[in-house]
Amino acid sequence: VRIARTLAAFGLCLVAAAATAQQDRTIRFGHLNNADHPVSFGVKRFSELLAAKSGGKMKVQEFPANQLGNEMQQQSALQGGVQQMSAPATTSLAGIVKEFGLVDFPFAVADFAQADALLDGPLGQALIAKLPEKGLVALGYWDLGFRNVTNSRGPIKRAEDLEGLKIRVIPNPVFLETFKAFKANPVPMPFAELYGALESRAVDGQENPFSVILSNKFYEVQKYVSATNHVYAANIVLVSKKFWDQLTPVEQKWMREAADEARGYQRQVSRAAAQKSVGDLQAKGAQFNEVAPAEQARMRQIAKPVVDRFAAQYDPAIVKLYNDELARIRKP
């Protein structure tokens, strides 16, 4: 009995020593959105949860608004282990894992429930599984929202209204080819340069979720806001694999739990903000219009050859999973 007690006491001492030895870690978490954007609110909630779980040993320093560089620069910094975390749009990952382009296929999901089911299910996990070999670890998907077109020329009510418009797009092949299918002139450009390009009329328009349009004051340089809802956009919570591999299993568990718990909050805040943003944009003088469901269906058909062409370039097993998942989530 005495030996058992001694061993038990020794075990408790080891646990206590491990907790005491748990080193303080500072996590530099960068993103391109402003501090009043729902992505930033997600970072703040993640930070609070992680601090609570780790007893203050794991601290998050947030760097919003491109402070650590644009999305590509931050991606490289994560891969190199210079920066610990970021939350870019999934679109930015298509350059290193081309199958992330599936998430950007136009008119794929009709609502938030379908979007969450697609990303939180087997497809989203299959994409995440491809990242460690690229030096990244993903902790899940946050909401950015449905993307919508703004421009300085006129309302977009039908596909033909996009013809000839110079539209800034994310430097992503699916986005480029989708807008070419609508006979627009897509211009790839880093987000940090966008406001100036709109102001100088170097481009006529751009496409982003409502909350991004409002937060970045694009209404100052864009008169027309059209609810095209052409792509559902998500952010992905990324960790440098070099940093991740330095963490203890307990620290990794805390990070996964904090990210999971922050996700529901971030999505709720983001979707409420999107709804409010429409009214706020109109109050700022933006001219807002919806696109009729029948016209959206027509636009989906116009973009279908783009979808088919890119799908043929991707891993067939993941494309099959994508199509199976779409069939599953679209069932009434």
Model features per residue range: what roles?
Residues 15-18:
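N-terminal signal peptide c-region/cleavage motif recognized by signal peptidases
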Residues 22-114, 122-125, 129-332:
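N-terminal secretory/targeting leader peptides
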Residues 1-10:
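Bacterial N-terminal signal peptides that target proteins for export
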